[in-house]
């Protein structure tokens, strides 16, 4: 069984919708980390640099769900709109601590059309 890490860096106002959409597309869980950062066009106010708040959402997903999750979130949450966020996926070489999830995944694989 192969897994990917899907990471979404999004406006905190989109977090709930991103999680709901990702779960609807096959994600089984998430981790949300509060963060801040700047984009390509830095924000300034009275000469001071302003860092935007962002949520970093992590999803460990089955490899075959990665594209569906990313496409669904990108479309439903308008990730391509400026300021909404970005998404990336990374290969996971090794994983532990997912025995309950793997059991559920195996059950789901019996009924899924790949």
Label the model's feature ranges.
Residues 1-114:
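Positively charged, small/polar-rich N-terminal and surface patches that mediate targeting and assembly
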């Amino acid at each position: 069984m192969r897994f990917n890490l899907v990471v979404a860096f999004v406006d905190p106002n989109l977090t709930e919708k991103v999680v709901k959409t990702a779960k609807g597309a096959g994600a089984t869980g998430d981790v949300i980390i509060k963060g801040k950062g700047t984009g390509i066009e830095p924000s300034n106010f009275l000469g001071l640099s302003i860092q935007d708040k962002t949520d970093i959402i992590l999803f460990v997903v089955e490899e075959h769900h990665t594209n569906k999750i990313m496409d669904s979130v990108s479309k439903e949450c308008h990730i391509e709109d400026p300021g909404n966020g970005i998404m990336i996926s990374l290969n996971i070489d090794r994983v532990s601590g997912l025995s309950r999830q793997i059991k559920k995944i195996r059950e789901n694989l019996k009924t899924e059309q790949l």
